[in-house]
Amino acid sequence: MARITVEDCLDHVDNRFELVIVGTKRARQLAVQGKTPMVPEENDKPTVIALREIEEGFIDASILDEKDEPQDTLIMGDADHSLDLGMHNSPEA
């Protein structure tokens, strides 16, 4: 795999500071939210995959306008659902 350079990525974002923010957000989407990579993974870490996506023009600063998916929603939703079904743990009297 060829090296990813900042200069190649800057063709798709305004400056290196925005590159860091865009790359970070996309890497989190890949690692934490389970988003599907737009480039072959090739055994790369999420940060490298994010930079490759930026370099190839699949990801740009518009990603910053997307709302993040809350991580606690699923956990709380499962807890509420189990309470509704009477599946909560209560001591027997």
Curated annotation (Swiss-Prot):
Enzyme class, broadest EC rank: transferase
Annotated EC: 2.7.7.6
A GO cellular component annotation in the UniProt record: DNA-directed RNA polymerase complex
Known catalytic reactions: RNA(n) + a ribonucleoside 5'-triphosphate = RNA(n+1) + diphosphate
UniProt keyword annotations, A-Z: DNA-directed RNA polymerase, Nucleotidyltransferase, Transcription, Transferase
GO molecular-function term, one example from the UniProt record: DNA binding
GO biological process, one term: DNA-templated transcription
Protein's UniProt keywords contain Transcription: yes
Pfam families: RNA_pol_Rpb6
NCBIfam families listed in its UniProt record: rpoZ (TIGR00690)
Family designation: Belongs to the RNA polymerase subunit omega family.
Annotated protein name in UniProt: DNA-directed RNA polymerase subunit omega
Organism whose genome encodes this protein: Teredinibacter turnerae (strain ATCC 39867 / T7901)
Gene encoding the protein: rpoZ
